[in-house]
Regions:
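Domain-level signal for Mg2+-assisted phosphodiester chemistry and nucleotide/NA-binding surfaces
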Residues: 2-108
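Nuclease catalytic cores that cleave nucleic-acid phosphodiester bonds
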Residues: 98-201
């Protein structure tokens, strides 16, 4: 990864992640698939996962555009346990470039005066209101609390020209956005193929 410390937060494409939630889901998948497949599952490849999210969000190879990846996380958490690279501090301001474009990471810890859900919603709202942002992909904690429902209500006001995708582990109530299943991109990042699952499910 390369250093991109002075890059602005927003790009034409933005991915906002509840990083602690994504890490927990990855852990659950690792435990379940290790038992099912009878082999060790390594930590998820973070760059591959981000690529899969971008594709699920409608980006195409050859777009050659910039993507802001915002990792919202608890202040007490230093990094992912189930992704590599893992350190939030080391990821902050770093970038990687591939066939989809350049992905620039920002790590945003939750301060004491707010909650992670509130912070994530504030980040999504700011991206939604930015003229620069054309495509927005959001991975909220859709299992605990009301973050998903609050996002759903807020996105009713979203500009129809913006392409917005929410990711969850199962189909959720719809709204002014597209939905994608989070597990598919995580399975790719964990190196679990459809062929390997044939006959196991």
């Amino acid at each position: 990864m390369t250093e991109k410390k002075n890059e602005p937060l927003w790009s034409e494409n933005v991915i906002v992640v509840d990083a602690d939630y994504a890490d927990r889901v990855a852990f659950d998948l690792i435990v379940n698939f290790e038992r099912m497949l009878g082999r060790r599952i390594p930590a998820a490849d973070l760059a591959r996962w981000i690529d899969c999210l971008a594709l699920d969000g409608g980006m195409k190879p050859g777009d050659d555009t910039s993507v802001a990846v915002v990792l919202v996380h608890d202040k007490s958490s230093n990094g992912f346990d189930n992704f590599l690279p893992a350190s939030y501090r080391e990821l902050d301001g770093k970038a990687f470039k591939d066939h989809l474009g350049e992905f620039v990471f920002s790590s945003v810890p939750v301060e004491h005066l707010t909650t992670k859900d509130d912070l994530l919603i504030d980040v999504v709202q700011a991206a939604m209101e930015s003229e620069e942002v054309k495509r927005l992909m959001v991975i909220p904690n859709s299992e605990d609390g009301d973050c998903y429902d609050r996002l759903r209500q807020m996105l009713r006001r979203a500009d129809d020209r913006k392409r917005i995708t929410l990711f969850a582990m199962q189909p959720m109530p719809g709204g002014n956005f597209r939905q994608e299943i989070l597990g598919y991109s995580l399975m790719q990042a964990l190196g679990i193929s459809a062929a390997e699952l044939d006959g196991k499910l």
